[in-house]
């Protein structure tokens, strides 16, 4: 499954052929997303990815976002995983990542990397006790730290984040869960302008537009990932095997997370 392309070969060839003869905005979207994701940062940015409910694909989005930022910025990206489950190791194709011995940053970059598990340009780690402290410390060495925060991240982590990405199913229940999660973030003093939503369809052909429009009408920036059989497979996530539209949406999400919100 890890090597299964999201789009069959005949469809990729047909898509390439038809794009020659029609005008689409894929190239311009990729260019804009790439420019946005490459914005320079003065301090390490912390991007929290959380699930509005269980089984929404939070780890998949966190890994996809981290891989996209690492590729576009051409630099290592830190990935902090709060929950102790096997999703991260399978998505990164690495051995289970044990908790760190300390949440404090190392004395230098080499020492920090030796305490982390590498998968391509992603360096993964689990906090010892304090995820917020670890995320702050990693900012000494990494321009971007993505935190796979599960469903119930610490309030300090989300209030200090430069972006909070809520992952939900593209359904009525999903939008309700998003509304509830956003209310909880507001109560925890999370900056509303840092909040982004990613809707993930459970099956091919699921109606997603109506649910996305509902959230956007509420003032919530919302992205919709297409159903992608490579990501849905549950194995190691490789951007090159994802569908073109999946890659574009992840790029646009990456650009949005790097856009500094008004404080």
Task: Name each model feature, range by range.
Residues 1-48:
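Extreme N-terminal, non-catalytic leader segments
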Residues 177-195, 212:
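Conserved C-terminal guanine-recognition region of P-loop GTPase G domains, centered on the G4
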Residues 116-159, 175:
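Phosphate-binding/switch loop-helix module in NTP-utilizing enzymes
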Residues 96-128:
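Nucleotide-state-sensitive switch-loop elements of NTP-binding domains
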């Amino acid at each position: 499954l890890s090597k299964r392309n999201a789009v069959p070969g005949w469809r990729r060839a047909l898509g390439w052929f038809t794009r020659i003869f029609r005008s689409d905005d894929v190239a311009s979207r990729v260019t804009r997303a790439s420019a946005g994701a490459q914005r320079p940062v003065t301090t390490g940015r912390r991007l929290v990815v959380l699930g509005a409910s269980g089984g929404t694909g939070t780890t998949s989005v966190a890994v996809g976002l981290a891989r996209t930022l690492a590729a576009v910025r051409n630099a290592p990206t830190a990935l902090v995983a709060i929950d102790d489950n096997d999703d991260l190791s399978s998505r990164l194709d690495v051995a289970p990542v044990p908790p760190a011995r300390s949440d404090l940053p190392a004395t230098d970059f080499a020492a920090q990397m030796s305490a982390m598990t590498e998968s391509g340009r992603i360096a993964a780690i689990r906090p010892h006790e304090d995820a917020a402290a670890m995320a702050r410390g990693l900012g000494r060495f990494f321009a971007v730290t993505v935190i796979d925060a599960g469903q119930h991240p610490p309030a300090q982590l989300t209030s200090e984040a430069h972006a909070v990405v809520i992952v939900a199913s593209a359904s009525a229940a999903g939008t309700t869960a998003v509304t509830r999660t956003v209310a909880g973030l507001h109560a925890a003093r999370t900056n509303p302008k840092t909040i982004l939503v990613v809707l993930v369809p459970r099956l091919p052909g699921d109606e997603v537009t109506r649910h996305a429009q509902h959230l956007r009408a509420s003032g919530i920036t919302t992205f919709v990932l297409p159903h992608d059989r490579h990501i849905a497979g549950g194995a190691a996530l490789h951007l090159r095997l994802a569908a073109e539209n999946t890659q574009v949406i992840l790029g646009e999400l990456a650009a949005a997370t790097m856009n500094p919100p008004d404080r």
